[in-house]
């Protein structure tokens, strides 16, 4: 007996994700080349083992000699994309934007301490969970990420430069809709 599958409405995002409800859990699937999907799957498994905030890899579906593969992750319950989070609460809300940025900064610090170079830190590659007045950021796209015994100052600086540029772009893009 196969589980009941229902396709929900697709949430607009730069990252093409297709959530699928498989009773009793929900998974997200991301098409990617096998060349990129295999290391991303391994990295997500490593992040889970290190108890770092990220989506949980379930597996990789591929057919020999065919691309794209499908990276399957557990859907992060009660999480929101930054667009949904900030569309509900304006950027000008008292301290809200600062808490969101603090959550991203904390995530990046945790990743760097564990020797993880993100490579594409952005609002679009992050999911957020609210819990009262706090916000927790989760890495959702690890396609460009790498793990090392320790990061060099240059790797940390470049990751931070990418974060600043991508977050500024994401916030400017969002402000144009408000």
Predicted regions and their residues:
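C-lobe/activation-segment region of protein kinase-like
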Residues: 135-178
């Amino acid at each position: 007996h196969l589980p009941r599958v229902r396709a929900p409405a697709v949430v607009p995002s730069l990252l093409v994700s297709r959530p699928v409800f498989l009773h009793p859990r929900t998974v997200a699937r991301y098409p990617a080349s096998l060349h990129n999907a295999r290391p991303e799957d391994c990295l997500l498994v490593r992040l889970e083992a290190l108890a770092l905030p990220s989506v949980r890899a379930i597996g990789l579906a591929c057919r020999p000699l065919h691309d794209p593969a499908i990276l399957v992750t557990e859907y992060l319950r009660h999480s929101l994309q930054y667009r949904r989070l900030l569309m509900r609460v304006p950027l000008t809300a008292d301290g809200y934007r600062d808490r969101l940025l603090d959550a991203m900064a904390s995530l990046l610090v945790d990743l760097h301490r564990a020797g993880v170079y993100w490579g594409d830190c952005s609002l679009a590659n992050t999911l957020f969970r609210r819990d009262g007045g706090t916000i927790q950021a989760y890495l959702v796209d690890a396609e460009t990420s790498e793990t090392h015994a320790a990061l060099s100052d240059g790797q940390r600086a470049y990751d931070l430069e990418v974060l600043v540029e991508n977050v500024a772009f994401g916030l400017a893009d969002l402000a144009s809709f408000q």
